[in-house]
Amino acid sequence: MAKKVTVTLVDDFDGSGAADETVEFGLDGVTYEIDLSTKNATKLRGDLKQWVAAGRRVGGRRRGRSGSGRGRGAIDREQSAAIREWARRNGHNVSTRGRIPADVIDAYHAAT
């Protein structure tokens, strides 16, 4: 005997019937998902439209990350000190602390 299992998504907002889509949104660093009918999804987007228009976009859709995600690779204290010393001797303006600009690091690697 065969069984058929059907999963029906119900509108999370008002429970009025089947949800047509899952909407993802974020607030205060927390991402939410809500299953909504087309009508309620349109209403949510309309309600948020004025806030979205006044805000700044800080990211897009998530993508899978490859590798360690550390970019060019971390540099240790000794290497950082050597790069800063080389940069000062060669006319680059670098701070005593903090991030070393990528162009300075590239110039250091090209020269050494």
UniProtKB/Swiss-Prot annotation:
Free-text function comment from the UniProt entry: DNA-bridging protein that has both architectural and regulatory roles. Influences the organization of chromatin and gene expression by binding non-specifically to DNA, with a preference for AT-rich sequences, and bridging distant DNA segments. Binds in the minor groove of AT-rich DNA. Represses expression of multiple genes involved in a broad range of cellular processes, including major virulence factors or antibiotic-induced genes, such as iniBAC or efpA, and genes important for adaptation of changing O(2) levels. May also activate expression of some gene.
Effect in UniProt of substituting residue 97 to A: Reduced DNA-binding, in fragment 66-112
Main location class: cytoplasm
Subunit text: Homodimer. May form higher oligomers via protease-activation.
Family to which this protein belongs: Belongs to the Lsr2 family.
The protein's name in its UniProt record: Nucleoid-associated protein Lsr2
One biological process term in Gene Ontology: response to iron ion
Keywords for this protein: Cytoplasm, DNA-binding, Repressor, Transcription, Transcription regulation, Virulence
Disulfides per UniProt: none
Superkingdom in the source lineage: Bacteria
InterPro entries: E3-bd_dom_sf, Lsr2-like_dimerization, Lsr2_dim_dom, Lsr2_DNA-bd
Subcellular location as annotated: Cytoplasm, Nucleoid
UniProt effect for mutating residue 99 to A: Reduced DNA-binding, in fragment 66-112
Source organism phylogeny: Bacteria, Bacillati, Actinomycetota, Actinomycetes, Mycobacteriales
Domain comment as written in the entry: The C-terminal domain binds DNA and the N-terminal domain is involved in dimerization. Both domains are essential for normal function.
GO cellular-component term (any): peptidoglycan-based cell wall
DNA-binding stretch(es), residue numbering of this chain: 97-102
Gene Ontology molecular function, alphabetical: acyltransferase activity; DNA binding
Residue ranges, annotated region (Disordered): 57-79
One Pfam family per UniProt: Lsr2_DNA-bd
Post-translational modification summary for this protein: The three N-terminal residues may be cleaved by proteases in response to external stress. This cleavage may be required for oligomerization, which leads to chromosome compaction and protection.
Disrupted-gene phenotype: No visible effect on nucleoid structure during anaerobic growth by whole cell staining. Sensitive to atmospheric O(2) levels, at 2% O(2) no difference in growth up to 14 days; required for adaptation to anaerobiosis, at 21 days nearly 1000-fold decrease in survival under anaerobic conditions. Consumes O(2) more rapidly. Has a significant lag in recovery from 7 or 14 days anaerobic growth. Decreased virulence in lungs of BALB/c mice; no visible lung disease at any time point. Increased sensitivity to reactive nitrogen species, not more sensitive to H(2)O(2) or mitomycin.
Effect the entry attributes to changing residue 28 to A: Loss of activity
